[in-house]
Amino acid sequence: MPRVSAVLIAQNEEGRIEAALRSVAFCDEVLVVDGGSTDATRDLVTAMQVRLIERPFDGFVAQKNFAIAQARHDVVLSLDADEEVSHLLRREIQDVCAGETLPQSGYRIPRITHYLGREIRGTDWYPDWQLRLFDRRAGRFKGDLVHESVKVDGEVGRLKGEIIHRPYRDEADHLRRIDRYTTLWAETAHRGGRRAWPGFGEAAAFFAFLRNYLFKGGIFLGSAGLTVSRMNALYVRQKFVKLKALEGRR
């Protein structure tokens, strides 16, 4: 029976880290790599008798790959501090790890976001498949400054249980994250030689709203669905506004 290490990276997550850690208490090991918290995150982790390693944050890909390399077991469940393992997912993980080896090299897991008081089962946010349970000998994180994901060699299965995601404390926090990630995206795209063609950002944002609100069910999610659709459109527009601004600095 393969043993499982739950691995998390964290930085200033005192309001959410305890729920995340409680949800993975069934794992054989729980490891947190802290990137330099200035709040009570580290104290909360140690109070829960969870293994803690401190390492200055130098990017999501590097930090997560460092974390999985420090795990004591080869089968890794990678979780973020704003996520929790649902009860069904816990049972599924225990089931797939009941044999001699992990049946697949990795497993994709649907992620459900909680936002403005409700589950967002629609828009671009659902189902947000994440490859999070895997054999570290077959996979690792890859990506850029904005997006990172696990890539594995071998067969990949799917689980039905969900990761519960609580990424934003409120709309203001959501807007701050949009500002941060669109800046990172624009800088990466600019270095790669991408251009912001006139009118493209506005058109892409318009179609992003239609896709999220009408075609992917945001309209059925009340005010939260409308807000998510608007925020996703804003994200698209701001990427190209900032890319255009960088082009003007040449």
Show which residues each predicted segment covers:
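Short, well-formed alpha-helical segments that are part of the catalytic scaffolds
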Residues: 7-26
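Acidic helix N-cap motif at the loop->helix transition within catalytic regions
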Residues: 15-18, 39-48, 88-89
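Glycine-rich, basic loop-to-helix element that forms the pyrophosphate-binding segment
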Residues: 56-71
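Cell-envelope/extracellular polymer assembly enzymes that use nucleotide-activated donors
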Residues: 3-5
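Conserved beta-strand segments of alpha/beta enzyme cores
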Residues: 29, 51, 155-157
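A conserved acidic beta->alpha catalytic loop
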Residues: 23, 34-44, 80
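Catalytic-site signature of metal-activated, phosphate-bearing donor transferases
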Residues: 68, 74-75, 79, 86-250
